[in-house]
């Protein structure tokens, strides 16, 4: 489950005054949740037995298979991640020294639905695997990109100088630039930009471009999953479809139940369907580049 969670992008989650970056993955019989406010990191991985006991404790008037509870829970969590509303009326959180308690309150078939994520402080290895190592790789990649851009700018300056030596004249003065000085640029950037970024108080999380970079550095390192054995339990470990149907039954006193009051089974979920709750829609097609116009004559 942790390997599957590692490959998911980080998304932002705002609950009252608390701002987190998080990722979550559901299967038909378990889930894994990871949250961080960049001061601490918390996680919970729950199996079927824990989920069943917690569902009975929190929702005494609802009866359903574990897969149905997880399906409905996923449909609550998914729209909240990275949304503008960010679940102000759905989620609440309480911190203690031992855990971060993330509580969910919703409605299902006219009845209240409750859930609690009991997140423990993540281990150092988890923090390193999901944040420290990827961030180090991202930093190295950005440094390499910066060096390539500096080389490109120097080549452009040399190209412009050659045009000027040939007698070319710039027709638009507003496009005139100074010769690129890498050392001067770095000093200016550190003095003017970096301090402003550190003091901006921006919510934790990655921009779209940084998230793509995170995905790129994670992809080659994420372990591949061994082929699942053909057993009766293999289906319960497959990622759950976001649109899985939900089958719940309201509990009634025993003397009022009839022999035909059995709980209907949830519909089967295709093996190819995936419930990555931090799924990002595919990027749109890039616009065609404009034809370059000459600046010298």
Curated annotation (Swiss-Prot):
The effect of residue 62 to D is:
Abolishes interaction with xrcc4 and DNA bridging. Does not rescue end joining in xlf-depleted egg extract
Q: Where are the transmembrane segments?
A: none
GO terms for MF = DNA end binding
Q: Where is this region: Globular head?
A: 1-131
Q: What does this protein do?
A: DNA repair protein involved in DNA non-homologous end joining (NHEJ); required for double-strand break (DSB) repair and V(D)J recombination. It is also involved in telomere maintenance. Plays a key role in NHEJ by promoting the ligation of various mismatched and non-cohesive ends. In some studies, has been shown to associate with xrcc4 to form alternating helical filaments that bridge DNA and act like a bandage, holding together the broken DNA until it is repaired.
Q: Site feature Leu-lock: at which residues?
A: 111
Superkingdom, natural source: Eukaryota
Q: Where is this region: C-terminal tail?
A: 220-286
Source organism phylogeny: Eukaryota, Metazoa, Chordata, Craniata, Vertebrata
Keyword list, A-Z: DNA damage, DNA repair, DNA-binding, Nucleus
Biased composition, Polar residues: where in the chain?
232-255
Copy the domain comment. The coiled-coil region mediates homodimerization. The Leu-lock (Leu-111) site inserts into a hydrophobic pocket in xrcc4.
What residue spans carry the Low complexity bias annotation? 263-286
What is the official name of this protein in its record? Non-homologous end-joining factor 1
Q: Which InterPro entries match?
A: NHEJ_factor, XLF-like_CC, XLF-like_N, XRCC4-like_N_sf
């Amino acid at each position: 489950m942790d390997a599957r969670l590692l490959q998911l992008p980080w998304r932002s989650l705002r609950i009252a005054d608390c701002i987190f970056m998080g990722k979550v993955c559901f299967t038909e019989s378990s889930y894994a949740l990871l949250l961080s406010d960049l001061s601490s990191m918390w996680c919970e991985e729950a199996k079927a037995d824990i989920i069943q006991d917690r569902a009975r404790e929190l929702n005494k008037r609802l009866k359903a298979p574990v897969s149905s509870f997880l399906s409905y829970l996923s449909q609550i969590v998914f729209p909240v991640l990275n949304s503008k509303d960010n679940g102000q009326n759905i989620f609440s959180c309480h911190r203690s020294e031992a855990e971060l308690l993330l509580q969910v309150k919703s409605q299902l078939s006219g009845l209240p639905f409750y859930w609690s994520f009991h997140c423990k402080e993540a281990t150092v290895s988890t923090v390193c695997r999901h944040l420290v190592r990827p961030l180090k790789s991202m930093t190295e990649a950005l440094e390499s990109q910066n060096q390539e851009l500096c080389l490109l700018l120097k080549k452009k300056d040399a190209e412009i100088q050659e045009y000027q030596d040939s007698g070319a004249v710039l027709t638009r003065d507003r496009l005139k630039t100074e010769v690129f000085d890498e050392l001067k640029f770095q000093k200016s950037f550190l003095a003017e930009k970096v301090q402003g970024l550190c003091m901006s108080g921006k919510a934790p999380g990655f921009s779209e471009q940084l998230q793509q970079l995170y995905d790129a550095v994670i992809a080659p390192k994420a372990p591949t999953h061994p082929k699942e054995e053909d057993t009766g339990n293999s289906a319960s470990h497959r990622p759950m479809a976001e649109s899985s149907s939900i089958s719940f039954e309201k509990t009634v006193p025993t003397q009022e139940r009839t022999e035909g009051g059995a709980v209907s089974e949830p519909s089967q979920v295709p093996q190819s369907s995936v419930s990555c709750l931090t799924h990002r829609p595919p990027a749109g097609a890039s616009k065609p580049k404009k034809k370059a116009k000459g600046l010298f004559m």
